[in-house]
């Protein structure tokens, strides 16, 4: 009997889904604790309480697990992005919500930014291409559509999509570095308040740069 003809019982299917999620959750927790993606299969197994062989069973390798983790935690953000594009609101407001959404996603999953960059700059070209397809290209396309809409309506000055992407994402990426800077320069500061202020500042700054008079 082929694997495609095997029907799992609801209980068995739930067990498999639960094990897969436990492995992903364990990897995420370890990356946050270590502030590094240098985690071993043995450590993931110990954290999850499962056998390390299950990593290969579900994901093929540790890299496969990390890509799956990226995909899982970015899925919600990408769905929200599609919903944003369909909204009947001003392009400037769409861009505000988009940029705030990126930094909110980083805040919700603090390992996501670190993992994304590690995968994009890693030695495995197929992995780099897959991560680019899953995460980078959708964000680039979203920004391109919002920019085109804003320029067509006269809300935005003409800007290069690629340059905008690099500058806007760079500012959003820096959001993940604020904790270390703040701890060194402002002992006892309210980290959550600082992050809220940073998000608002970046959104205001980037959207203001798109105004028709900004480039004059």
Show the residue positions of the predicted features.
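Hydrophobic alpha-helical connector segments
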Residues: 68, 82-114, 162-168, 196-199, ...
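Generic hydrophobic, amphipathic alpha-helix propensity
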Residues: 19-28, 44, 69-73, 77, ...
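A contiguous binding-surface segment within folded domains or other stable secondary-structure elements
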Residues: 117-148
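Amphipathic alpha-helical segments used for helix-helix packing
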Residues: 108-129, 178-185
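Helix-turn-helix
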Residues: 22, 30-64, 68
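Short, structured helix-loop boundary elements
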Residues: 20-21, 41, 63, 67, ...
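C-terminal peripheral helix-coil segments that are non-catalytic and often amphipathic
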Residues: 1-8, 104, 108, 137-153, ...
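Short coil/turn segments at alpha/beta junctions that flank glycine-rich nucleotide-binding fingerprints
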Residues: 33-37, 88, 109, 153
């Amino acid at each position: 009997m082929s694997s495609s003809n095997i029907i799992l019982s609801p209980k068995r299917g739930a067990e498999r889904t639960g094990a897969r999620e436990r492995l992903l959750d364990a990897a995420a927790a370890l990356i946050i604790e270590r502030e590094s993606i240098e985690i071993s299969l043995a450590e993931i197994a110990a954290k999850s309480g499962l056998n390390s062989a299950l990593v290969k069973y579900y994901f093929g390798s540790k890299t496969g697990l990390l890509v799956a983790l990226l995909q899982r935690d970015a899925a919600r953000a990408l769905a929200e992005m599609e919903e944003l594009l369909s909204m009947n609101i001003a392009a400037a407001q769409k861009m505000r919500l988009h940029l705030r959404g990126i930094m909110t996603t980083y805040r919700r999953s603090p390992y996501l930014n670190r993992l994304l960059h590690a995968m994009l700059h890693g030695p495995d070209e197929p992995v780099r291409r897959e991560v680019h397809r899953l995460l980078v290209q959708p964000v680039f396309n979203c920004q391109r559509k919002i920019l085109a809409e804003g320029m067509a309506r006269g809300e935005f000055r003409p800007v290069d999509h690629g340059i905008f992407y690099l500058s806007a994402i760079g500012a959003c990426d820096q959001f993940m570095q604020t904790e270390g800077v703040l701890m060194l320069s402002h002992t006892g500061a309210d980290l959550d308040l600082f992050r809220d202020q940073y998000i608002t500042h970046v959104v205001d700054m980037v959207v203001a740069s798109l105004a028709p008079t900004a480039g004059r």
